[in-house]
């Protein structure tokens, strides 16, 4: 859950998001070390009068500044590629949820069950109950089980949308005529908020996403009440 004046990421609630946070810290440390080294060299150049005016060739230096950046790029690329493959991997999902974007609401269909589908609209500010969040609450939440692999099938009925839930590390474009796929697995119960992350028209800001992640037993009880 985000909070005002937040500078960092939201707390990770899925294995994918945890990996993304580790990769962010890994890359940020490399960037910090490189920036510190460059600033140190610049400060030396500005504060000293020593210089080599007759240097015409320095093969050792050229070799170092060719090999070192290549090694750094490899250190960044390898974990990045690993996470990309993890995000695309779909292994025998326990549940499939089809998501369709509209101007300006979402519709959901639990494809493993017959006639279990609904639309999800933002709750107007005038109808909010105490404790509910402005521009983030919906009339019908998605209810999903925790610790199970869930396949998301995402598309759009009209224009480009993007289905994004930061805490779960999910952001997939909803494109008309194309069915995109994503994996979702929550590591703990909770209510997670997201929004459409692709400018899609006048009411783009009013397309919230709310996921209620519950233990499997509670999910089965919810299913019985909906079917």
Curated annotation (Swiss-Prot):
Q: How is the cofactor bound?
A: Binds a dinuclear copper A center per subunit.
What's the Enzyme Commission number for this chain?
7.1.1.9
Mitochondrial intermembrane topology ranges: 1-14, 88-227
Which residues are listed for Mg(2+) binding in this entry?
Answer: 198
Positions annotated to bind Cu cation A2: 196, 198, 200, 204
Bilayer topology: Multi-pass membrane protein
| Keyword Transmembrane helix in record | yes
Query: Where does this protein hold Cu cation A1?
Result: 161, 196, 200, 207
Keyword Transmembrane helix annotated: yes
Its GO biological process annotations read: ATP synthesis coupled electron transport
**Gene Ontology molecular-function annotations:** copper ion binding; cytochrome-c oxidase activity
- UniProt keywords, alphabetically: Copper, Electron transport, Magnesium, Membrane, Metal-binding, Mitochondrion, Mitochondrion inner membrane, Respiratory chain, Translocase, Transmembrane, Transmembrane helix, Transport
Official protein name in the record: Cytochrome c oxidase subunit 2
Where does the chain cross the membrane?
15-45, 60-87
| Similarity remark | Belongs to the cytochrome c oxidase subunit 2 family.
Segments on the Mitochondrial matrix face: 46-59
**One GO CC annotation:** respiratory chain complex IV
Q: How does it assemble?
A: Component of the cytochrome c oxidase (complex IV, CIV), a multisubunit enzyme composed of 14 subunits. The complex is composed of a catalytic core of 3 subunits MT-CO1, MT-CO2 and MT-CO3, encoded in the mitochondrial DNA, and 11 supernumerary subunits COX4I, COX5A, COX5B, COX6A, COX6B, COX6C, COX7A, COX7B, COX7C, COX8 and NDUFA4, which are encoded in the nuclear genome.
Identify the stretch annotated as signal peptide in this record: none
Stored Gene3D superfamilies: 1.10.287.90, Cupredoxins - blue copper proteins
**Major location (coarse):** mitochondrion
Subcellular localization: Mitochondrion inner membrane
Chain's role = Component of the cytochrome c oxidase, the last enzyme in the mitochondrial electron transport chain which drives oxidative phosphorylation. The respiratory chain contains 3 multisubunit complexes succinate dehydrogenase (complex II, CII), ubiquinol-cytochrome c oxidoreductase (cytochrome b-c1 complex, complex III, CIII) and cytochrome c oxidase (complex IV, CIV), that cooperate to transfer electrons derived from NADH and succinate to molecular oxygen, creating an electrochemical gradient over the inner membrane that drives transmembrane transport and the ATP synthase.
Task: Give the cofactors, semicolon-separated.
Answer: Cu cation
